[in-house]
């Protein structure tokens, strides 16, 4: 299912780069495009800036999320790769745990990448009914790249960069496995929540972000078709 290519991976994964600075909203030209979907990117640590750039190219309005107030009015959320322990401690420090659970529970589309998959699992936020193994493929020197066929993603294989990546060791019946490597799930979906063990943003891969936006569009269309009570 995956054609792996060792090497050629820039430092990242559970990384220390992209440490959060002062809160700011991101938009081209400093203005929110009219009618654009507002997608939050958790910006406590990690490679959140790469996600904001991809969202901008897709016409969405990214917002860096550091405190609960930043979650207000979001149409979707991305939890990026980085150091899962640092991100988890930041969530606890800023009081983001319950607000993040409520956001996911409301049906808002959520995507977690690499460390984001860990943050979403049973042992952390508990948003996804999965249990993961950290650094499952080995440490930094065992990082690799692979082309994966993902269920629900058209246009050929997704180029995936695995850096100190996790894999899923256990999941509930309500979790759909979208891709595997070495017979272990590395991409999953449970309702409105997606998680992948790799870094699409480091490869310039936009289809996972499009999947998030497409899920949002279907949710909006379904709500509109029901009309007022």
Tell what function each PLM region has:
Residues 2-3, 167-229:
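C-terminal and late-domain segments of enzyme folds
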Residues 78-80, 111, 162, 195-197:
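Structural motif
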Residues 83-149:
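Cysteine-nucleophile active-site neighborhood
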Residues 44, 115, 198:
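Cofactor-binding loop segments of dinucleotide-utilizing enzymes, especially the Rossmann-like FAD-
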Residues 1-93, 102, 206-210, 214-229:
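N-terminal beta1-alpha1 cap of cysteine-dependent amidohydrolase-like domains
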Residues 61-63, 110, 193:
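Hydrophobic anchor at the start of a short beta-strand
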Residues 123-184:
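Pocket-forming structural segment of enzyme catalytic cores
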């Amino acid at each position: 299912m995956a054609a792996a290519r060792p090497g050629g991976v820039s430092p990242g994964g559970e990384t220390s780069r992209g440490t959060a600075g002062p809160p700011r909203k991101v938009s081209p030209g400093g203005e929110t495009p009219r009618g654009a979907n507002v997608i939050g990117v958790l910006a406590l640590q990690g490679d959140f800036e790469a996600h904001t750039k991809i969202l901008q190219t897709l016409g969405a309005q990214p917002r860096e999320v550091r405190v609960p107030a930043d979650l207000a009015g979001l149409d979707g959320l991305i939890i990026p790769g980085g150091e899962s322990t640092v991100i988890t401690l930041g969530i606890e420090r800023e009081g983001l745990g319950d607000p993040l659970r409520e956001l996911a529970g409301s049906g808002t589309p959520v995507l977690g990448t690499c460390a984001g998959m860990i943050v979403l699992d049973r042992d952390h936020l508990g948003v996804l009914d999965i249990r993961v193994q950290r650094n499952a493929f080995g440490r930094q020197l065992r990082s690799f790249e692979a082309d994966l066929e993902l269920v629900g993603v058209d246009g050929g294989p997704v180029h995936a960069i695995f850096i100190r990546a996790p894999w899923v060791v256990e999941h509930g019946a309500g979790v759909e496995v979208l891709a595997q490597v070495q017979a272990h799930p590395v991409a999953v979906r449970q309702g409105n929540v997606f998680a992948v063990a790799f870094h699409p943003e480091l490869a310039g891969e936009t289809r996972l972000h499009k999947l998030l936006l497409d899920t949002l569009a279907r949710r909006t269309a379904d709500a509109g078709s029901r009309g007022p009570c």
